[in-house]
A protein has these predicted regions:
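C-terminal portion of ABC ATPase nucleotide-binding domains
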Residues: 547, 557, 566, 571-606
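A short, proline-enriched helix->beta-strand linker immediately N-terminal to the Walker B motif
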Residues: 522-526
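Helix-to-loop junction immediately C-terminal to a conserved catalytic motif
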Residues: 417
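Membrane-integrated ABC transporters
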Residues: 1-51, 60-99, 105, 112-117, ...
């Protein structure tokens, strides 16, 4: 097997794009051997069935008389020897049956080959998509943050499948090559000189479409880049549909979308026209040269009627074959930018991969999370998100981090979860630096509840159980009860089996947040971070969430960190941290800070 693998690597060295699939293990030795075997069998049955027509035509021409007036062809001698070996007589009936069997076997092998190539193509497309998805999710936050939504969706969905299409195009091209070799072999045995003329003509036709292959490559690069910007546009507009409707901007947005659609239409038409040139040029040229070759062979090489018939049959088959060959070369060129895009994502994300298991396990209890003289600046930003911030978050208490938008609140919690690393200073769990602990052990002790709830198109039970797949139904129900979510869940038609629509659109914002809170409680994390989680909920839901947090803090020794700029959200807080423009303004107990001259006091007065 190792020798076979080395041979495959050597052969694929001439096809760097194809070698990529093998190098990254999207394509195995068995896949290649299976595909090649099926295509080889298709070719063998095709060639032999065509060659069988020669002795059959010779028999028909002589009206079944085996004592031909003209010396039999080479093919007659081959088939006569073969039939005699099995004790069969070479006649019209046996040859006709042989042709029927060979055609059936050829079609059977072709069917198996098509199914195999399509299966392989979709499997590789799936594996490419999953490798990209895994790589992006496992990369550091800086890499993920720079990956736009449109590029993410386009890479996972469109580009992965398009890249896999190159694999099928290469396989089809290889099959065509085998078919051409088979046809020309039959022709060479029948009439060597005439066959050389046909081969030369075929080579010239293949070279003539080279410029269209380059055009297809350039157009495909434009399509890849355009799809990303188009997907970004659509995703951005869909996320902000409320703002569009309220501002009565529907017509303007539709007009803008039409400009994108028009550009995509123009690119698609250009690709279609470029591909259509194969039909416009290759087929007529091939027909003219085929007729010329046929004329030369009949006049100058004195071929028999049976040999002329086989030449006509092969030349007629070569016309669509040569056209298909040109199409597949264009397809490879069209898929190449997608393959490069996908492989670059896989390589780049791998180079930015977080190592989750390096370091000690954070298992000990600690009195506080200490932020010491931390400074952080986002890449490509001129401003410091945090500047020399020193503060402390006591464990088993409720801490609120407040401040204006852009004050650094979310950046601070990202530092606690080790999603980012400070440029200066350090984060400590107790007296030990976060750098000593593995990222996995730190994040296992943290649950994050965002302003936009992550709700799946699944049942209530499955949505809550997501963080702990092994959790029992009773544990899920207890978590929902703690999150004050059990009342509304029991009022749903199917209770815990009720299917929540994508993003939870069939329940209210407050109910979605309580589902998220139940999920956080089920995870049994020590630290729960709520990033403006009550910002878009009604007063009643906010009060329910506040009660749930009070309950979980009191009875379960949880550290609650609340990011907010709404004063109602931070009732019954034990500790308060105030940020402004990336700097620490104050920290301490709320009842003490409300007398200081700071942003918190001004907000309370308002």
């Amino acid at each position: 097997m190792k020798n076979i693998k080395n041979i495959i690597i050597f052969v694929l060295g001439s096809f760097p794009d194809l070698k990529v699939f093998f190098t990254y293990r999207f394509l195995g030795v068995f896949d290649i051997l299976k595909a090649c075997t099926l295509m080889l069998l298709v070719t063998i049955f095709e060639a032999v069935s065509v060659a069988t027509f020669i002795p059959l035509l010779e028999l028909l021409q002589s009206e079944g008389d085996l004592n031909l007036t003209k010396p039999p062809s080479v093919w007659w001698q081959y088939f006569d020897t073969f039939y005699k070996y099995f004790g069969l007589e070479l006649n019209i009936l046996t040859l006709s049956i042989s042709i029927i069997i060979l055609v059936f076997l050829r079609q059977l092998m072709n069917y198996l080959n098509i199914v195999n190539l399509l299966t392989l193509k979709h499997r590789v497309g799936r594996d490419l998509a999953m490798s990209c998805l895994k790589g992006i999710f496992q990369a550091d936050s800086a890499y993920i943050r720079n990956f736009k939504t449109g590029a993410f969706i386009n890479t996972i969905d469109n580009q992965s499948q398009s890249a896999a299409g190159m694999l099928r195009a290469f396989a089809t091209l290889f099959g065509i090559f085998l078919t051409l070799v088979a046809y020309f072999s039959v022709m060479l045995i029948t009439s060597p000189l005439a066959s050389l003329i046909a081969i030369t003509i075929m080579g010239l036709i293949i070279l003539s479409v080279e410029k269209w292959v380059k055009v297809a490559l350039d157009l495909s690069k434009d399509v890849v880049n355009f799809r990303e910007s188009y997907t970004n546009f659509l995703g951005d507009r869909y996320r902000n549909w409320r703002a569009i409707k309220i501002s009565s901007s529907e017509d303007r947005e539709v007009a803008l979308a039409k400009t994108y659609a028009k550009k995509y239409f123009i690119l698609s038409v250009k690709i279609a026209k470029n591909s259509g040139k194969n039909i416009l040029v290759v087929s007529p040229i091939m027909t003219v040269f085929s007729l010329a070759t046929l004329y030369i062979t009949v006049i100058h090489f004195n071929l028999s009627i049976s040999e002329v018939a086989i030449f006509i049959l092969i030349l007629v088959r070569l016309i669509p074959t040569s056209q298909n060959m040109a199409n597949q070369r264009q397809m490879i060129a069209a898929c190449r930018p997608s393959l490069h895009k996908v492989i670059n994502v896989i390589k780049d994300s791998a180079s930015k991969k977080e190592n989750l298991n390096i370091g000690q396990s954070l298992t000990d209890q600690f009195e506080a999370i200490n932020i010491i003289d931390v400074t952080f600046t986002y890449p490509k930003s001129k401003f410091k998100a945090l500047s020399k911030v020193t503060c402390s978050i006591p464990t088993n208490k409720k801490t609120a981090i407040i401040g204006r938008s852009g004050s650094g609140k979310s950046t601070l919690t990202d530092l606690i979860a080790c999603l980012i690393s400070p440029k200066e200073g350090e984060v400590k769990f107790g007296s030990k630096s976060s750098n000593l602990f593995s990222l996995r052990s730190i994040r296992n002790r943290i649950t994050y509840v965002s302003q936009q709830p992550l709700i799946f198109n699944a049942s209530v039970f499955d949505n809550v159980q997501y963080v702990r797949p092994s959790a029992s139904r009773e544990e899920v129900m207890n978590a929902c009860k703690t999150a004050k979510a059990d009342t509304f869940i029991n009022n749903l038609p199917n209770k815990y089996d009720e299917i929540l629509h994508e993003s939870g659109t069939n329940i209210s914002g407050g109910e979605r947040q309580r589902i998220m809170l139940a999920r956080a409680f089920l995870k049994e994390s020590d630290i729960i971070i709520l990033d403006e989680a009550t910002n878009s909920v009604d007063l009643e839901s906010e009060e329910e969430i506040t009660k749930a947090l009070d309950h979980i803090t009191k009875d379960n020794e949880k550290t609650i960190i609340i990011i907010a700029h709404n004063m109602k959200t931070i009732q019954n807080i034990d500790h308060l941290i105030i940020l402004d423009k990336g700097k620490l303004i104050a920290q301490g107990k709320p009842e003490e800070l409300k007398y200081d001259d700071n942003w918190y006091k001004k907000m309370l007065e308002q």
